[in-house]
Amino acid sequence: MSRSRWIFAMVAALSVGAACSDNPTSGSARAGTLTLRLTTPHADDGAMTFEVSGAPIDGATAVDASLRLFTRRVDGSTMVGAMAGNLANGAVVTLHVPDVGAAARYTATVLEMANRQDQLRASLAGYALTVAP
């Protein structure tokens, strides 16, 4: 085998290997899920409305079957949601996204919060939502 054919064969083999790799190159998107986590100063939260935006969102599901989630897509990269149930610190929503590498582009905001007796909180101080893999 000539040297040029051998080099061509090696380059072809490496290219095929890279194309079949589980580690995509930096320019390719990888669909998956991100987690929306709630930070709350109270132990008796029962409902909230929130907004997530920044990058495309395909859908959302509650992380726990005891939580009820309703969503409305504002546009391709903004979703408004309402969640009811015994809300506590930690994961509350799973976001289905076309590119998990874009996690840093998402922002999430608590719009309203109510206690378990359906009374709106007078202040949202201490509440936060974060989006992370």
Annotated model-derived regions:
Residues 20-133:
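Acidic, low-complexity intrinsically disordered segments
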